[in-house]
Amino acid sequence: MVKGLYTAYTGMVNEQNRMDIMTNNLANASTVGYKKEGSTSQSFNDVLTVKIKDQSVGMRNVQKIGIKNPGVKIGENYTDYTQGSFRITDNTYDLALAGDGFFAIEFTNKAGETDTKYTRAGQFTLNKDGYLVTEEGDYVLDTQNRRIRLNTLLDSKITDDGTIYQNDQAVARIQVTDFEDYDYLEKYGETYYQPIDGAKTTTADAQVKSGYLEMANVQIVSEMVNLISITRAYESNQKVVQTIDGTLDVAANQIGKL
């Protein structure tokens, strides 16, 4: 009976994790460059249940009862890198990537340390010093891993290969990087990614589209349907816990009075 309580509990923990992920997806449905997340479930290893020390089969004999599965556990959380839809902005520095790849960003943490992060969120602008930066103020890098600085008094044109022109002169080229295996990317915040040990870069085939933004790849209706399904599964496990709790209460407090 207590094992049934544990099985229901693990089911609730698993559904709570899925619910948190779906809720975060819905919260970021309007976030530029956001990639939705998902979660897999994994069952615990089956256990062979046996009956031992039973007078009916002899003290030294073991009788097999059957296979028991003690419930489910969280498998893994993953990111869906499917490309999102494009929204037209007509802003030169709003950039979207058509194809696989990421913009390279010089990120500075609270301790003042810098490293390179990668993102699909191309909502860029020029700061007061003329540097191309993200909404958070992080610097966009060129193909030489340098900050991109432009003349704020001149109009810019950005071509599909990421080259920036001012006065018909190429002044910089935006770096677009891709990776052989996205399993070696770790999410940092909502739209940044950082490579982990073993990550290998490769040539990106993405085109840079100026005047567009890639929106989140979250399908709101689909996420809502999944959320309802998860809620019902959670409630079912919750009712199992309540039922077993009531049964244990009867066994402990009422049967003993007879």
Cite the ranges covered by each PLM segment.
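Amphipathic alpha-helical polymerization modules
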Residues: M1-L258
